[in-house]
């Protein structure tokens, strides 16, 4: 696991599944869960973490390689899920999401910032063939970190956000 003011680990990246782990002293977050719940549990164990300790999963977009394990993890461990409204609509009938309690589903509006414990998270739009894909910037104290995936084009604005992280 690497550390730059945040602890983080790329659990998986590629067309077979994407999942990224981020930790601060107060929060443990997954960005996407594109593998089975069982596989993500195994990958978390490799970095000495447990899925029951996760506070939330942030969803970048509705493609299966980003949401495969989202539903099962949410149901089994009761964690909160965050995505923008169009992504939620696109996932509504997804076999990967299944039945998740409405109290676990939260809207993360694109272009907005949310505070999760000791970390601020900002979302931005991305160029990709999905309903409303987004990427996230994580900010804590004077540090920032960007998680950007599946983009077909890097705009000047995106480059500036990444460059300043």
Where are these regions (language model features)?
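Structured catalytic core of nucleotide-sugar glycosyltransferases
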Residues: 9-19, 56-70, 74, 92, ...
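Active-site metal-binding loops of divalent metal-dependent hydrolases
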Residues: 12, 33-35, 62, 86, ...
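Active-site metal-binding motif and surrounding structural segment of the metallo-beta-lactamase
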Residues: 38-83, 164-165
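Conserved beta-strand hairpin/beta-sheet module of binuclear metal-dependent hydrolase folds
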Residues: 1-47, 133-150
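Active-site-proximal loop/helix segments of hydrolase catalytic cores
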Residues: 130, 146-165
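Short, well-ordered alpha-helical microsegments
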Residues: 37, 67, 91, 133, ...
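Metallo-beta-lactamase
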Residues: 85-134, 139-142
């Amino acid at each position: 696991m690497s550390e730059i003011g945040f602890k983080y680990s790329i659990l998986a990246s590629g067309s077979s599944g994407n999942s990224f782990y981020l930790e601060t002293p107060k929060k443990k977050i997954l960005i996407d869960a594109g593998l089975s719940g069982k596989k993500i549990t195994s990958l978390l164990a490799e970095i000495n973490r447990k899925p029951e300790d996760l506070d939330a999963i942030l969803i970048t977009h509705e493609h299966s390689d980003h949401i495969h394990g989202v539903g099962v993890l949410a149901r089994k461990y009761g964690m909160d899920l965050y995505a923008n409204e169009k992504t939620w609509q696109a996932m509504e009938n997804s076999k990967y999401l299944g039945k998740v309690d409405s109290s676990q589903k939260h809207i993360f509006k694109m272009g907005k910032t949310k505070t999760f414990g000791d970390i601020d998270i900002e979302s931005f739009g991305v160029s990709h063939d999905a309903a409303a894909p987004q990427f996230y910037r994580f900010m804590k104290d004077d540090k920032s970190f960007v998680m950007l995936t599946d983009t077909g084009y890097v705009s000047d604005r995106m480059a500036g956000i990444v460059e300043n992280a």
